[in-house]
Amino acid sequence: LTAAYTFGESGLTLSVADLWWAGQGRGKYFNFKSHETAHHFEAGLAYTLPVEKFPLSIAWYTMFAGMDKKLNDKGEEKQNYSSYVEFNYPFSLKSVDLNVTCGIVPYKAARQYNCNGFAVTNVALKGTTAIRLTDKFSLPVFAQAIWNPRMEDAHLVFGITLRP
């Protein structure tokens, strides 16, 4: 669940998200107690550079409450404030809209991102185009290759977009 607000044409977006990663049948969804919940509450700030020929966007997300914990020197569980930073660069080639993504974990976030320090955790390329089916209808399709070098994990995602 995400709530976001974009500040006019400034390129700045502020967001707050409630992320649920426990999985089906694990944890109680409506339990929001700090040391029991499976929710992660995250604040985000995104900015797109106001340069038409270089529309790079930069986003920083930090978990500020919920399950994102670490043990301090006394062995007490404390909020970890795990963060993720993402850079996106959109561009087009012929009739295909492309987006290159690079995501990093800037510092230790062992429990959430399995990182003991700075790590590249997301490298992706997404392509979107429309397949013309009739004179009046085109089907928007996309394909995305995603790689997490830190986890040595890769995914291919394909999809369609239906609009009224």
Task: Report each predicted region and the residues it spans.
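Surface-exposed beta-loop-beta
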Residues: 114-116, 142-157
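Outer-membrane pore/translocation modules
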Residues: 1-86, 113-118
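Outer-membrane beta-barrel "beta-signal"
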Residues: 125, 152-164
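Short loop/turn motifs that connect adjacent beta-strands in outer-membrane beta-barrel proteins
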Residues: 6-13, 50-56, 90-99, 128-141
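Structural signature of outer-membrane beta-barrel domains
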Residues: 19-23, 63-67, 105-109, 146-150, ...
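A C-terminal functional module that forms or caps the active site or interfaces directly
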Residues: 85-88, 99-101, 105-128
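Transmembrane beta-barrel strands of outer-membrane/channel proteins
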Residues: 14-18, 58-62, 100-104, 141-147
